């Protein structure tokens, strides 16, 4: 293993095919389940969603989202247990979940972000790490953001990677504080969004597969009993 990367390659958590199209709450519950059940080693899995807005544990949905727009456009809503801002995801995004033993959060974020960014550069996208938890293109547009929380003596990092997205739906759903955007020199949500499809000569399914190849070297297949336990945990999300 490369000494630079203490948590990679990780073990790929494989879901049964019937779990490919679930709501966000299912996959967030799966993170918890893996953290609580497999208490040694590093695990990673990817997932995709129908149009969904996921907001942080301390956020007020009506302050972050146009709820009427979401309802009218079939956009699901889910609160995660980590902090951070509200994100919009659809089938052209890749969600990444990393579960590791408890460790220094700053170093984990740095390692994870650099590992992913380095992999994207090898695939042809001119990315770099920005701040603690973002990956951006060389022109400053954001293509990946990440959040973290602690569960059962484990660290859980989850990220959203923008291969492409329905920008108009995203803009309609999200209502960020304009003053906060301006303080960061951002004119609008749209101006800050980058899409990896501009640089990669393959589709989102291929990108997802290549990420797993880059980040893992073994796999763990979840059983039907595992899925039932995850579905029970899913009920704790709203």
Residue ranges and their predicted role:
Residues 91-133:
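Contiguous, small/hydrophobic- and glycine-enriched helical/loop subdomains that border
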Residues 63-65, 103-109, 169, 204-206:
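Short, conserved charged micro-motifs
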Residues 65-78, 146:
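Short, hydrophobic/aliphatic alpha-helical segments
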Residues 114-116, 123-125, 144, 151-238:
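Long, positively charged amphipathic alpha-helical accessory segments at protein N-termini or as interdomain linkers
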Residues 48-53, 130-139:
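Short, glycine/charge-rich beta-strand/loop segments that flank catalytic centers
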